[in-house]
Regions:
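Conserved hydrolase catalytic core segment
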Residues: 124-170
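Active-site loop/oxyanion-hole signature of alpha/beta-hydrolase fold enzymes
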Residues: 30-47, 79, 86-134, 172, ...
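Acidic catalytic loop of the alpha/beta-hydrolase fold
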Residues: 277-281
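Conserved alpha/beta-hydrolase catalytic His-Asp/Glu region
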Residues: 44, 193-264
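An N-terminal hydrophobic leader/cap segment in hydrolases
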Residues: 1-36
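Conserved HGGG/HGGXW glycine-rich cap/lid loop of the alpha/beta-hydrolase fold
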Residues: 47-97
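Catalytic active-site module of serine/aspartate enzymes centered on a nucleophile-bearing elbow/loop
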Residues: 294-340
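Short beta-strand/loop motif that positions the catalytic acidic residue
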Residues: 266, 272-274
């Protein structure tokens, strides 16, 4: 990875906590064939900030967001000596937005494969994974696929309906096949090509975002544009259709309970940072996870909603950094350094 190949977004300065943070680049992910599927090539947007010799930390965004959503903590982590990477997951941000015909259903299995390939090809060393919401499911999947490349995992928070509503009992193959066809038919009927552009240009984006925050976001125009911009792309509707189908038809092994069971024996350090006032994924879900998996640690962040990294970055980092100290010891950076 050559620093000369990386381009900073404009306007940009190392200290600025804006959605344009970091040096930006494009990466072509070649997804390997499986079960009759041919090679697929997708262009993915990613960014980096911090010293080249610093330990690696990868930030994975939530649903509807992108790498820019880490605007308030990425510069602070880089100042502490981390080399901070962030990736726009397939279908989000400035990465490609394939539909069902181009790439099939999109789910955390694919995003986990994408992140694993990113670690192997771009980061090129084991890293700490920090995810927000959907990014956590991707991080969990990556840790199962490539445990040798994940040093620790931070979930802020951990979403999955399967955590509160058990998966239905497994039906016969013919019944599952008809269920899949029926769901695909319904999803194809949804006029998302009309709905998504309308929502992207309406106040609904701000109203939906406000549900994820305790503080008012009315005047945070940068945050609103961060969500609106990818939704205005002509390929956004087809990608949303692929995600809706993919996340609805995930196999049991791709759900959070199954992934946690697989990680339970690996001794992977895992921390959950949960907003006290999270209206999307209530704190009770986090407490339930800890009761079932005592090896997972939970820290509650006061007066925060679903996006604590953006709502209260100082409280977020004050909870994160001591935990990294305890679990990574001498292999994490010490103190402030000059950013790249």
């Amino acid at each position: 990875m050559s620093a000369n190949a990386l381009q900073p977004a404009e306007p940009w300065c190392p200290e600025a906590e804006t959605s344009a943070w970091g040096f930006h680049n494009k990466w072509t992910w070649v997804r390997q064939p499986s079960r009759g599927r041919k090679n697929q090539q997708w262009t993915c947007h990613w960014r980096v900030l911090g010293p080249n010799n610093g330990p690696a930390l990868v930030l994975l965004h939530g649903f509807g967001a992108s790498s820019g959503h880490w605007r308030r903590i990425a510069p602070k982590l880089a100042a502490q000596g981390w080399q901070v990477f962030s990736l726009d997951l397939l279908g989000f941000g400035a990465s490609d937005q394939p539909g069902l015909r181009q790439g099939g259903p999109l789910d955390n299995q694919i995003w986990g494969q994408q992140t694993a390939a990113f670690l192997e090809e771009i980061v090129q060393r084991p890293a700490v994974l920090v995810g927000n919401s959907l990014g956590v499911l991707s991080a969990l999947t990556t840790a199962v696929l490539t445990p040798h490349l994940v040093r620790a995992l931070v979930a802020a928070p951990l979403p999955d309906p399967a955590l509160v509503q058990p998966m239905p009992r497994r039906h016969s193959p013919w019944r599952r096949s008809w269920q899949r066809r029926g769901l695909r038919f319904v999803v194809q009927l949804l006029p998302l090509q009309w709905i998504v552009p309308l929502i992207a240009r309406s106040k609904l984006i701000r109203l939906g975002l406000q549900g994820a925050y305790t503080r008012s976001i009315t005047n945070d125009l940068e945050l609103q544009e961060l969500i609106r911009r990818p939704a205005r792309r002509p390929t956004a509707a087809r990608a949303l259709r692929a995600m809706t189908l993919g996340m609805s038809l995930r196999p049991r092994g791709a759900t959070a309970p199954a992934l946690l069971e697989q990680l339970a024996t690996t001794r992977l350090p895992m921390l959950m940072l949960w907003g006290q006032n999270d209206r999307f994924i209530p704190l009770a879900v986090g407490r339930q996870v800890v009761n079932q998996h005592p090896w997972v640690e939970l820290k509650v962040l006061n007066d925060c909603g679903h996006c604590p990294h953006d709502e209260d970055p100082n409280q977020f980092l004050n909870a994160l950094m001591p935990w990294l100290d305890r679990n990574l010891g001498n292999s994490r950076p010490a103190g402030d350094v000059q950013q790249r």
